[in-house]
């Protein structure tokens, strides 16, 4: 059994270089919600040195709200914004001897693309037109994952160690009770359920089936590094190999 571990980096949280020793995929902020050219360059350089897959982490242009405020924009604006951010990170990656391997939207863009076909199609179209070999990271069972596959892109279904789920498989919004899970033992147990049994218990008690191919370890919490070490050790202790999506066997991608 195999799984990818990913983290959102380049967001000014201070533990990026150390986290890159523990994850297999890095989603690097492209400057629109956090980070900037120097942070992008640092993260890319470290990822290249450590052999971690480089991913773009585009967002709405919303640094005031860390990209977490939902926006209603025309598809053309979303398309252009994603292209702009992919181009910026790709240029830096090329200069540092690396290349982008995947794209994972950030914050509100991620959540809206997960449920809104128009937004999903706009993001997917930008990725496909930029480089159809790029993989797409999206919420497991989401509209976004379906749109990516319909467009012929490789889609990697993502689950979250520290987030609550609703019965329909969507994440509990951050402003609602049950959205965030703080207890590390609970997070580890839930992650093992998602990876080994492909299910997670929703806040209402229901079991939700999902295809966990990559686990997000948020890099912006105060204990992010300690938890990343614990979750990787827990996975390896039960025989799960931690590898980047490009190394996943066919049965793990199904």
From Swiss-Prot:
Keyword Nucleotide-binding belongs to the record: yes
Single annotated GO MF: ATP binding
Known function: Catalyzes the cleavage of 5-oxoproline to form L-glutamate coupled to the hydrolysis of ATP to ADP and inorganic phosphate.
Catalyzed reactions per annotation: 5-oxo-L-proline + ATP + 2 H2O = L-glutamate + ADP + phosphate + H(+)
Record has ATP-binding as a keyword: yes
Family designation: Belongs to the LamB/PxpA family.
Source domain of life: Bacteria
SUPFAM superfamilies for this protein: Glycoside hydrolase/deacetylase
Quaternary context: Forms a complex composed of PxpA, PxpB and PxpC.
Assigned keywords, A-Z: ATP-binding, Hydrolase, Nucleotide-binding
InterPro entries: Glyco_hydro/deAcase_b/a-brl, LamB/YcsF/PxpA-like
Single biological process term from Gene Ontology: carbohydrate metabolic process
Protein name, entry field: 5-oxoprolinase subunit A
Enzyme Commission number: 3.5.2.9
